[in-house]
Amino acid sequence: MTTAHILGFPRIGAQRELKFALERYWRDGASADAERALVDTGRALRAEHWRIERDAGLDCVTVGDFAWYDHVLTTLAHVGGLPRRFGFDARALTLADYFAAARGNAAQPAMEMTKWFDTNYHYLVPEYSPATTFGPGVEWLFDEVREARALGYRAKAALVGPLTLLWLGKARDGLVERLALLPRLVPAYRALLARLREAGVDWVQIDEPIFSLDLPDAWRDAARPTYEALAPGAPKLLVATYFDDASEHAALLKALPVAGLHVDLVRADAQLDAFVADYPADKVLSCGIVDGRNVWRNDLDRSLARLAPVRDALGERLWVATSCSLLHVPVDLAHEPRLDEELKTWLAFAAQKTREVAALRDALVKGRAAVAAEFDDAAVVAAARRTSARIHNPLVKRRVAALTDADARRASAYSVRAAAQRARFGLPLLPTTTIGSFPQTPEIRRARAAFKQGVLDHLGYLEAMREQVRIAIDKQLAYGLDVLVHGEAERNDMVEYFGELLWGFAITSNGWVQSYGSRCVKPPLVYGDVYLPEPMTVGWASYAQSLSAKPVKGMLTGPVTMLQWSFVRDDQPRATTALQIALALRQETLDLEKAGIGMIQIDEPALREGLPLKARERAAYLDWAVRAFGIAASGVADDTQIHTHMCYSEFGDILPSIAALDADVISIETTRSNMELLDAFETFDYPNEIGPGVYDIHSPRVPDADEIERLILLALERIPAQRLWVNPDCGLKTREWRQVDAALAAMVDAAKRVRQKVEEAAPA
């Protein structure tokens, strides 16, 4: 019979139970009681998620999709591959060890973190050296198998594949080619798979999303011998590709000695024909037809029409699935009591998507009539959404149509603007600043909660937030920073805050998704045309500026990041939606400038993240992304300084586009890579000013001034002192004030030391 399954379920819990359990564990110093509570929470969450999958009608539950912090790190723990610098015993790895690799400890900094393909999820980057070894690791996956079987479930295991695990890592300490480690890694996977078979697991989903990339020949050539080595003695293997088109590798994948393949038909519907043609008779084909990355309800009739010919060709060898893991969507729409009722009918979260998968399976097996009520309701909703008046704003459409190329360019060249800005601000060499946010303290959270609950009135809330702005300004002045920020106390999230104030956006109550570890975000829903009804940030920036003679930056989130970190409407091109957001931000920058704010930061941390996985599609994306930023930033005068910020990014392949943004100052995350990201600037003459991060804010570890000084000196090897800024990697929202106080004082001290050295070395 046609099988219904999903590639993975969100692990945070419907009420973010995992987040809070993790934070209690860390706060309690990883005590035995705290660890027991954390382990119990994980076990309860897995049981609940499997219950949802069973009740939806799926044919199996997925185990191995759970992770305490990150599934790539967990895979490394399974195969004994954590970085050697930590000195951990792979077979005796504890939760404390695992978290030390993720978050750093007193002896070692945390593992580097970067985006999982083109999503907003972050994984921990494996570290590979000539000395790297693999072997038996933790028992966690087998614990999950035993739990599922004890509850009576048929379990399919999920693992990050060996090729993807190597591809995602970084070569260090003289290792020339990561593939050289494959002969060491494959035996560890073989042993893991053999044990899964012994444990009674029939199917193992091996995630190899790198087959959606433009792979070098050496990596393609490694696929067949790898799976020829893995298949004997293993359960049935389902190799899963997702996030883009894998059709260029279709012949290779179909020839692998595995029991099935999975393809993503949401991101790359056209690839289906390449896989169905001459599909091997000994394989199942899992079709990812329900979107694992967006929240809009599936058009079941359309999906059924797409799958019916595949069913006719393959029969029971057709499996129905989500496009990718549901890690990227909220858990359950049932926890949205305050969401607009019409909008709510357009949505499906993870729990609803599991049922959509099962409903499509039922229609294929039993006929549409067997699930007519579900299909008819979905059809009515799809038609209503297409024609809803709340989606379309004629004024916005006219403004987008009237945009010209000149609207996306500053009036003067950078050299002219830089002179005007130097004259206006008079900053010292190596100016110091921060990226924007300061700690979201319990006081801030209590005030926000009281305001939302109606306990605190609007005036009381404003007064509470203004007090937090004053505290942030006073602290920055005490540190000796040169350029200040207001601290963003009023913002619960850098995208959601703006989504609450822009028309065309909607905000959920509980639509949380995991970003990394315990960090969760609540992406807004972009359901219609975007419009700015009134200024969003001017009052906060103006108040902060009134507290100091030093410049205070206005803080905005850029159009591409707003797009990338939201659930975006799927009824018009993303480029069009980006331009609508850019127009709203352009008006905000002009309002800030009019209010006397001379520096405006428009953050685009997701610019690189949005880059298509396929090289052939990147130029078009970068063209509209750069244009959107230009429209947002280019209405201001020459002496208004535009900043931007990017994080979690590899920049080498898009430096020309970053330069084309023409921001006066760009700050980037570089600490975890030990300034490696700046290597690209040795061959590309970046024309404007740049602030490479010198303090890793993702770790609770506080650097001293000597460490920061070393990083500044490394940056000076690539960036002229006249164009170098000193700042942390990212915003400081997730840190505690005691950490921030020590780190920023050290940063300012280090900058002063290096400034003195540079000035002393300058010709008289």
Swiss-Prot record:
Catalyzes the transfer of a methyl group from 5-methyltetrahydrofolate to homocysteine resulting in methionine formation. Its cofactor is Zn(2+). The active site is at residue 698. The gene is metE. This is 5-methyltetrahydropteroyltriglutamate--homocysteine methyltransferase. L-methionine binds at residues 435-437, 488, 603. Belongs to the vitamin-B12 independent methionine synthase family. It comes from Burkholderia mallei (strain ATCC 23344). Zn(2+) binds at residues 645, 647, 669, 730. It comes from the Bacteria. It is an enzyme of class 2 (transferase). One of its GO terms (molecular function) is zinc ion binding. Pathway: Amino-acid biosynthesis; L-methionine biosynthesis via de novo pathway; L-methionine from L-homocysteine (MetE route): step 1/1. GO terms for biological process: methionine biosynthetic process; methylation. L-homocysteine binds at residues 435-437, 488, 603. The lineage of its organism: Bacteria, Pseudomonadati, Pseudomonadota, Betaproteobacteria, Burkholderiales. It catalyses: 5-methyltetrahydropteroyltri-L-glutamate + L-homocysteine = tetrahydropteroyltri-L-glutamate + L-methionine. Its EC number is 2.1.1.14. 5-methyltetrahydropteroyltri-L-glutamate binds at residues 16-19, 115, 519-520, 565, 609.
